[in-house]
Each structure stands twice: as C-alpha cells, then as structure tokens.
C-alpha cells in the first residue's frame, strides 16, 4: 500500500475517532507493518497543522529466535532428557545431538540425568527421574501469549542470560487532530518555477514549508586516527612551549647512535636480540663520524671527562650493527652532536614524536612498534630543579597537575627520575614518563661546552591515547583488527587542560 493511501486511511480513522489513535494499534488493525503507518504520520506532519503526533515509548518482552524455537519444540535439556532410553546412552553419542552440549549441562544441574563412568564402552548417561516438567518452555509460551507479567524478575533474568528473552522498546505515535485537520490532502509544491511566477499561479498553490532543522548530506571526508589526533595535540603543546621538532627519519639506526653514543655499554641487556630487532641486510653501517667514534670508544673503555668509564674492550664491529631504533633518544643524540659542531653554542629546545621498535611479547598493552614522545632542553647550568619545573609545565598543559617524582636509573642520564601522576579512575599513582639529566660522558665527547647541561624526558603516545578514548586493548587501537568505524566516530582530541587542585604531597 502506497504512503498516500495509508495517510488517507489514517485521516478517515482519525475523523471517526473521539480522541486519537495509536500508530501500533492502527497498524495491527490494518494488517500492515508499523513502519508504514509511521511513514504516513511523518508525511502528514510535513503538511503543517493537519495532525498532531506525540512520540511515546513502551517496553515489552519478546522471544529471541532461539526462544521461539524452544517455545515450539522444548528446551535443550528437555530434548536431551527425552533422547535418553531406559538402557542409557553413550555420552559421546549424546554430545553429538543438536542440543547435546547445552542440554547436557542444564539437565545435569537439574539432576534429571547422571553419568556412569564405569561402563565398559565409556561414560554412559542415564535418567535419574521418570518424568520432568519443562519449565523453560512453559515460561516462554507465557511470554509468547502476552502474559510476561506472570513471570517473576528472577525467571525473566534467567531467560535473558540464556538469550531466550529480550526486552524491546517500541516507539509509537499517539495521533490526534490538528488545528488544520482535513480528510482531503492537497499536494504541496516543493519548487517555485518560472512559469508559476509569470502566470501568477503561485498565489493559489500551497507550498511545503522549509524545514530548517533537517540535516543535510554529510560530505565525504577523511578522518584522523585517534593516535594521530592525540599526536597533533602533543605537538601543539611542544610548539606553544617554544620547542623545535627534530628530524626523526632514521627508522634504521646503527648501534653506535642507538646505544654507544648514549654511554650504554655493549654488554647491556637492552642490546640483546630478545629486546632489539637487528637487520640482516644491510647488517652494518658504513658511515660513522670516526673522530667522534674514537672519543666515545675512549670514554667507554678508558674513561674520561671525570668518569672511569666501563673498563671493557669496546668493539667497532658491535657499534656498526644496524637495527630498528629502540628509542628516539638516538635522534636526540644526532641533534645534540650537530649542535655541538656549531660555534658558539646556542641554547635549544627540541622535541620529537615518532615510532620506535622493541622485540617484545605482544599482549593487550604491548606491541613491537609504538610511538615515543621526547623533549630535550640544552642550556648553561641546567639542574634537576629546572627539569622538574619544565615537567610540571608540560604535564599541566596535558591536564595533569598531580605529579610525583621517583629516583630511577638510566645508563645515559644522572640523576634520573620516573614521573608519576594520580589516576582519578584507578585511584592510584601511575607512571606517565621517564626523565633525567644527560651524563657528561654522553655530552662532552660530542664537543659540547662543559658548563652546558641537557635535560630530557619521554613517554609513550599510546598510553594517554588509550586512556583518553577508553581503550583497554592496544590491538583495538593499532593493527589489522582496528574497527574503522571507531576511527570515523572518534571525536576530536581535547586534552583536559583545566588545572585541578594540587596534591597534598607534590614530590616523593
């Protein structure tokens, strides 16, 4: 039946009624889909004050597809019970029945059946009772007959847990006569043509009013992944603080820049194959600044610059090994080395946000590839107090004001600190970053002046993104299992920059 015919039927029924009509009841009387009546109601609403329609919501219980089947044929446990003959049935054969697995466990819990494991041909199932009442089928038949109110809350809850029953919200319209009610519908014009204007016929024709609340068609456009949205926000914070972005295009790095230049010994556990991806081809880096390499070698093996070094036989072959960088601190080392070659020294503030790679076991919170955020400040006479001040400013811009600092160890920073923030949701202090002052054994071989200090800190990009978007499994954020609809629906990233009251104890 066309929409116009349904609308005419609705108007005639409404004219004959005293107060109004319910759209669902009208659909049942006319023997048509409720949605067809709803479409007619909306068409009449568009004509102006012909009708008034009030949206109403009612909840009722409906059987699921499995519930309908059980209401007809009986529950799984009842079917299992009926399938067991007096001499019993092999458990393996029973499990092959369509209702075997579910019905067996339910029938056992109801104590309708038992298992005899001493049978010669394997476990055998026997009836315990002569007959049983299929309460599940009886309850579902009550619901199907419109008597769901006879079931208790506990009974309905059990049926819902078994996915046999569902609570459905039905939206209907209560339709009544409007101020301009009429049973005859005149077609409204939607366009004003030149012919109407020239002939003047527009004066006698009804026009459909503009709907200024209607939504237009959304234009197709690209959508940023949540990780990129948070990355953009972090980048903006660094730029607001006067930082310059470092080049980070060296995904493949030599062990020299990734480890040795950072005063990390060649026997350090982090350089093991269990933690690092080494390259097979090209296996070695051929171009290294050899004068700088010699100074690094001397610092490692003999000491210098006020340090005893590590006192071991430093090997160039080990330093040449290519790898996928394990941190962006290698990019910081390259940037500081370039800075040291410029005379005179100029204070700088650098930052980087890019991918790093670790040979780690994959789980809900760890991937072999992730993003590292790093900030570096180089100036004369910087101290631990400067580092704490910069960290407080940085994290305040992220909306994190409750900070604690804990002493830690890093091969290339001394002193070193872990940064903790109080997580309101978890109700505990969680680590949000690592920081420290670069060691002289790292800076002086580069050629930086002795009175220059470099403070640095870093954190991952994935952790704050997961917290921001309520994601518990990192594989829902990155990888081939990512739901593209999540990327489409995710709102803009707006980090909470509203400062909260400071903690009672700021440092520990």
Curated annotation (Swiss-Prot):
The modification Phosphoserine is found at residues 193, 301. The modification Phosphothreonine is found at residue 190. Mg(2+) binds at residue 414. The modification N-acetylalanine is found at residue 2. It is an enzyme of class 6 (ligase). Keywords: Acetylation, Aminoacyl-tRNA synthetase, ATP-binding, Cytoplasm, Disease variant, Ligase, Magnesium, Metal-binding, Nucleotide-binding, Phosphoprotein, Protein biosynthesis. GO terms for cellular component: cytoplasm; cytosol; membrane; phenylalanine-tRNA ligase complex. L-phenylalanine binds at residues 329, 372-374, 412, 438. InterPro entries: aa-tRNA-synth_II, aa-tRNA-synth_II/BPL/LPL, Phe-tRNA-synth_IIc_asu, Phenylalanyl-tRNA_Synthase, PheRS_DBD1, PheRS_DBD2, PheRS_DBD3, WH_DNA-bd_sf. It catalyses: tRNA(Phe) + L-phenylalanine + ATP = L-phenylalanyl-tRNA(Phe) + AMP + diphosphate + H(+). GO terms for molecular function: ATP binding; magnesium ion binding; phenylalanine-tRNA ligase activity; RNA binding; tRNA binding. The modification N6-acetyllysine is found at residue 311. GO terms for biological process: phenylalanyl-tRNA aminoacylation; protein heterotetramerization. It is found in: Cytoplasm. The keyword Phosphoprotein applies. Its EC number is 6.1.1.20. Heterotetramer; dimer of two heterodimers formed by FARSA and FARSB. It is linked to Rajab interstitial lung disease with brain calcifications 2: An autosomal recessive disorder characterized by interstitial lung disease, growth delay, hypotonia, liver disease, and brain abnormalities including diffuse, symmetrical brain calcifications and periventricular cysts. Belongs to the class-II aminoacyl-tRNA synthetase family. Phe-tRNA synthetase alpha subunit type 2 subfamily. This is Phenylalanine--tRNA ligase alpha subunit.
């Amino acid at each position: 039946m066309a929409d116009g015919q349904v609308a005419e039927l609705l108007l005639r029924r409404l004219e004959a009624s005293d107060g109004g009509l319910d759209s669902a009841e009208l659909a049942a009387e006319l023997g048509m889909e409720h949605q067809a009546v709803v479409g007619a109601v909306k068409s009449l609403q568009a004509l102006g004050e012909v009708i008034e329609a009030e949206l109403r919501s009612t909840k009722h219980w409906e059987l699921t597809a499995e519930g309908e089947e059980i209401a007809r044929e009986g529950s799984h446990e009842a079917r299992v019970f009926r399938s067991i003959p007096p001499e019993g049935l092999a458990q393996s054969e029973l499990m092959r029945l369509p209702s075997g697995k579910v019905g067996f466990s339910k029938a056992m819990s109801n104590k309708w059946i038992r298992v005899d494991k001493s049978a010669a041909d394997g476990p055998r199932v026997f009836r315990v009772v002569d007959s049983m009442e299929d309460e599940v089928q009886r309850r579902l038949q009550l619901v199907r007959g419109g008597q769901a109110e006879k079931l208790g809350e506990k009974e309905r809850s059990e049926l819902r847990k078994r996915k046999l029953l569902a609570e459905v919200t039905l939206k209907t319209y209560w339709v009544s006569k409007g101020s301009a009610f009429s049973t005859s519908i005149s077609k409204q014009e939607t366009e004003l043509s030149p012919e109407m204007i020239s002939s003047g016929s527009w004066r006698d024709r009804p026009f459909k009013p503009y709907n200024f609340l209607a939504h237009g068609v959304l234009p197709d456009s690209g959508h940023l992944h949540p990780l990129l949205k948070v990355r953009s926000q972090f980048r903006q914070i660094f730029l607001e603080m006067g930082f310059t972005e470092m080049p980070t295009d060296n995904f493949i790095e030599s062990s020299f820049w990734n480890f040795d230049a950072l005063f990390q010994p060649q026997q350090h556990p982090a350089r093991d194959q269990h933690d690092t991806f080494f390259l097979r081809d090209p296996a070695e880096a051929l171009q290294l600044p050899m004068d700088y390499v010699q100074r690094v070698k001397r610092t490692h093996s003999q000491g210098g610059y006020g340090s005893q070094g590590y006192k071991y036989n430093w090997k160039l072959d080990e330093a040449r090994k290519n790898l996928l960088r394990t941190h962006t601190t290698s990019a910081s080392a390259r940037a500081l080395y370039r800075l040291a070659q410029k005379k005179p020294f100029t204070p700088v503030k650098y930052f980087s946000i890019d991918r790093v790679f670790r040979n780690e076991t994959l789980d809900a919170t760890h991937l072999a590839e992730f993003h590292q955020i790093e900030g570096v400040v180089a100036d004369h006479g910087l101290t631990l107090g400067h580092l704490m001040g910069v960290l407080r400013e940085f994290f305040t811009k992220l909306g994190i004001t409750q900070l604690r600092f804990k002493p830690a160890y890093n091969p290339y920073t001394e002193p070193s600190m872990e940064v903790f923030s109080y997580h309101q949701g978890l109700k505990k202090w969680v680590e949000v970053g690592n920081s420290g002052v670069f060691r002289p054994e790292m800076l002086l071989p580069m050629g930086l002046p002795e009175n220059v200090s470099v403070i640095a800190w870093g954190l991952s990009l994935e952790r704050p993104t997961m917290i921001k978007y309520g994601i518990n499994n990192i594989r829902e954020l990155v990888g081939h299992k990512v739901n593209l609809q999540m990327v489409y629906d995710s709102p803009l990233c707006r980090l909470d920059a509203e400062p909260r009251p400071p903690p009672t104890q700021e440092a520990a």
